[in-house]
Amino acid sequence: MALIVGFLSLETRDSAAAEHSETTYSYGSHDRQKLDAFWNASDSKRPGVVILHGGYWYEDSGWATWSRHFADKGMAVFSVDYRLNFDAPWPAQRNDALSALTWIKANAAKFDLDPDRIVVLGSSAGGQIATSLATYGSGGDRIKGVVALSPVASPYRAWNDGNHDDSTAKERKVRDNATILARCFPDPADTDASLHASCWDTWKDMVVKNRASGADDAPMYLVHSEGDFVPVQHSLDLEAAEEVGHDMPADGVTVETVTGSAAHGGGLLDTAGMPEKVITWIKARV
């Protein structure tokens, strides 16, 4: 990504018709605190989609193609990078996403964006961050909703799933990187905060359902495949915490399983009809 200081872009790519723009901006001082903005010319304010990539919290993944797709559907799109697990422990990743949102809203006029009509889309590890934005504080006041594809909504569940003799390589990779994210192994007995932040408190904070509060949280559309290595139970547990534990309306969290598929994260958008479902869900809320 090209470095942008303040509001000045070092690189802007426009379409031949000068109707489409792509620019990289910095929303913080760390090299990872950048975002790519995609938008088309508009005579009116439009809704926004903030994309948080996956990659086990430790690597990046490209979202340019889908960012352009969503921009062509009438939205201003922001593909956000954040500090990875070897850069900083949790909750730095959630803090970065919050900072990016603040920057986007403050600069909404540049993109013909309505700052009150923003949805967050997260994939895999990015889905964990995205859903945490829905439940952290009054998420419903911050954003209009979250679409999460294979969200690792419970890194603790993922740690356990990856800690068996028959665990797959991908399950172990999630386990190991969740451990790096927390900077410790999950141990309910480790509650000592005198020398460090409590390990167990960090793991509990990483589990999205633990911050569920019902009506204060943003609505969510959570999607997994039937053979996903991040199983749908992650999202079902979050749905139960919101709708059963905290009386969120029954349509506050929608969980969908794509049958006959093992697609994961952004790969779910290659499923027939899924991009249309996602766009329909977003537009119904913005």
Where are these regions (language model features)?
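Secretory targeting and sorting signals
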Residues: M1-D14
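Alpha/beta-hydrolase superfamily serine-hydrolase fold, recognizing
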Residues: D14-V286
